[in-house]
C-alpha cells in the first residue's frame, strides 16, 4: 500500500523518534512544521529545534511559523493537501480550520493514558503524584485540550526511582511504536475511536519553577516524588544559607528528625528530617556550582548535623 502523505508537527527531542519512524515506514512526509529557531546559551546563538535537524537531513521541507493559526499558514498547509497530520509535542494549539484539512484528520501522540493527565506536562505530574503506570495514547484531535477520541493505548510501568528524564526517553520511543500500530490499523481500516470519560480526567499543567520548592513538613515519599518529577528541569529545590540548593536524587531513609534539619552526613548521602521520617540526598547542586554526588559535594562544602535546609 502506498504511503500516506503526512505533515508532521513537532518540536523537541521527544518528537524525534516518531518522525524518524514515519520516514522509516516509507510514509510520504511532505513537510515538517516546527517552532522557530530559538537563541540559547551565553552567546544567544539561534538553535534549530531537534525535529528540524532530522527533517533537513532527509530533505523534507520545514515550516517554522510564529503562529500556526495565522490564516496564511493555514492556507499554506491546505495547499499541501495532506492525508494526515501527525502531532507530537508541537507547542502550539491548532485551530479548527487546520484540524479539518486532512482527510484522516490530525492524530496526536500524548504521553499519558488518557483521559488522565491532559495538558502540557503529563510525564512530570504522574511522577509527582506517585503513579506506578503511565503510557502513550494516540488521539484523534479536536479543538479541546487533549479531549479527542482515543485510538491506541500502550502502557508501561514506572520504576520506583525513575525520574522525568528517563521516563521521557522511554515514552518517546513508545510513542514511535504506538504511531506504528495506529497507522497500520488506519491503513487496513481497523482503527476504532473511543470517547474519553471526562469524569476520569486530571490535568498536568506546565511546570512552574516555584512548584519545585520543597516543603520539609511533607512525608519522605512525597518529597522524593517531587524530586523525580522535577528532574532534570526545572529542579526541586530548597535553600542553604540563603542559596538555592537543587536536589536531583534522593531516597527514603529510616531516621526521624525535625523537618529540614540535617541529621547525618557521609559518603552515602546527607540525611535530612522530613514529615514523620527522613530523606537521603544523593545528588545535588548548590547555586553557582555543578551538579554533584553527595560525596563530592561534601568534599567542597562542609555540612554538619543541626544545619537547617529551607526557611
From Swiss-Prot:
GO terms for cellular component: cytosol. Its EC number is 2.1.2.9. It is an enzyme of class 2 (transferase). (6S)-5,6,7,8-tetrahydrofolate binds at residues 112-115. SUPFAM superfamilies: FMT C-terminal domain-like, Formyltransferase. GO terms for molecular function: methionyl-tRNA formyltransferase activity. It catalyses: L-methionyl-tRNA(fMet) + (6R)-10-formyltetrahydrofolate = N-formyl-L-methionyl-tRNA(fMet) + (6S)-5,6,7,8-tetrahydrofolate + H(+). InterPro entries: Fmt (IPR005794), Formyl_trans_C (IPR005793), Formyl_trans_C_sf (IPR037022), Formyl_transf_N (IPR002376), Formyl_transf_N_sf (IPR036477), Formyl_transferase-like_C_sf (IPR011034), GART_AS (IPR001555), Met-tRNA-FMT_C (IPR044135). Keywords: Protein biosynthesis, Transferase. Belongs to the Fmt family. Attaches a formyl group to the free amino group of methionyl-tRNA(fMet). The formyl group appears to play a dual role in the initiator identity of N-formylmethionyl-tRNA by promoting its recognition by IF2 and preventing the misappropriation of this tRNA by the elongation apparatus. This is Methionyl-tRNA formyltransferase. It comes from Geobacter metallireducens (strain ATCC 53774 / DSM 7210 / GS-15).
Amino acid at each position: 500500500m502506498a504511503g500516506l502523505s503526512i505533515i508532521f508537527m513537532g518540536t523537541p527531542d521527544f518528537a524525534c523518534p516518531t518522525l524518524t519512524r514515519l520516514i522509516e515506514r516509507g510514509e510520504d512526509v511532505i513537510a515538517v512544521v516546527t517552532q522557530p529557531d530559538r537563541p540559547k546559551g551565553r552567546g544567544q546563538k539561534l538553535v534549530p529545534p531537534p525535529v528540524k535537524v532530522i527533517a533537513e537531513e532527509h530533505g523534507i521541507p520545514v515550516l517554522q511559523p510564529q503562529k500556526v493559526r495565522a490564516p496564511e499558514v493555514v492556507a499554506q498547509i491546505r495547499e499541501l493537501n495532506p492525508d494526515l497530520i501527525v502531532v507530537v509535542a508541537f507547542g502550539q494549539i491548532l485551530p479548527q480550520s487546520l484540524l479539518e484539512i486532512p482527510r484522516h484528520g490530525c492524530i496526536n501522540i500524548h504521553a499519558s493514558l488518557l483521559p488522565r493527565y491532559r495538558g502540557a506536562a503529563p510525564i512530570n505530574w504522574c511522577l509527582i503524584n506517585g503513579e506506578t503506570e503511565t503510557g502513550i495514547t494516540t488521539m484523534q484531535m479536536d479543538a479541546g485540550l487533549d479531549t479527542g477520541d482515543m485510538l491506541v493505548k500502550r502502557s508501561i510501568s514506572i520504576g520506583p526511582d525513575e525520574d522525568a528524564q528517563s521516563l521521557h526517553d522511554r515514552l518517546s520511543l513508545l510513542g514511535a511504536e504506538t504511531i506504528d500500530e495506529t497507522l497500520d490499523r488506519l491503513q487496513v481500516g481497523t482503527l476504532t475511536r473511543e470517547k474519553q470519560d471526562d469524569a476520569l480526567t486530571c490535568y498536568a499543567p506546565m511546570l512552574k519553577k516555584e512548584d519545585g520548592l520543597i516543603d520539609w513538613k511533607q512525608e519522605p515519599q512525597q518529597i522524593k516524588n517531587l524530586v523525580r518529577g522535577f528532574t532534570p528541569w526545572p529542579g526541586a529545590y530548597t535553600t542553604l544559607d540563603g542559596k538555592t540548593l537543587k536536589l536531583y536524587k534522593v531516597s527514603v531513609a529510616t531516621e526521624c528528625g525535625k523537618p529540614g534539619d540535617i541529621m547525618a552526613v557521609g559518603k552515602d548521602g546527607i540525611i535530612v528530617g522530613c514529615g514523620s521520617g527522613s530523606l537521603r540526598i544523593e545528588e545535588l547542586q548548590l547555586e553557582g556550582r555543578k551538579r554533584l554526588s553527595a560525596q563530592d559535594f561534601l568534599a567542597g562544602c562542609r555540612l554538619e548535623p543541626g544545619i537547617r535546609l529551607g526557611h
